[in-house]
């Protein structure tokens, strides 16, 4: 199977991470003694798609990866992938933008003295 241009453009570290994810999914399936056919059936995907998942194919939708992880009982960790509380880069950037000091707000004039 030929990989798309967008998949080839992925950074090496991302391709490695996807490959590891696929290998981990394959190992988890085998540890649970699930055949490829049964796993694919439970995830509502074809055996070919499951093979692509287990290879870490970047062209497979995130929803399919989520479905496979659900079948394995591992979907609960998906919510932590981009958890804002764990986003060290984002938190650092946010901290850099914080004001150095905060001044007390000036009281607003009541508008007295203006004719009504």
Regions found by a protein language model. Give the residues of each.
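Short, charged recognition helix plus adjacent turn
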Residues: 79-116
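Helix-turn-helix DNA-binding elements, focusing on the entry/boundary residues of the two helices
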Residues: 25, 36, 47, 62-65
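Short, basic-rich loop-to-helix N-cap that marks the start of a DNA-contacting helix
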Residues: 57-70
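A short, Lys/Arg-rich alpha-helix, primarily the initiator
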Residues: 6-31
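Short alpha-helical DNA-recognition segment
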Residues: 33-51
């Amino acid at each position: 199977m030929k990989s798309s241009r967008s998949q080839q453009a992925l950074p090496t570290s991302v391709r490695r991470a996807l490959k590891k994810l696929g290998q981990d999914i394959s190992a988890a399936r085998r540890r649970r003694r699930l055949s490829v056919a049964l796993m694919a059936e439970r995830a509502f995907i074809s055996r070919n798609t499951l093979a692509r998942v287990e290879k870490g194919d970047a062209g497979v939708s995130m929803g399919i990866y989520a479905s496979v992880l659900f079948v394995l009982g591992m979907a609960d960790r998906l919510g932590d992938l981009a958890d804002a509380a764990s986003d060290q880069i984002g938190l650092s950037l946010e901290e850099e933008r914080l004001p150095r000091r905060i001044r007390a707000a000036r009281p607003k004039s009541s508008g007295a003295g203006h004719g009504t």
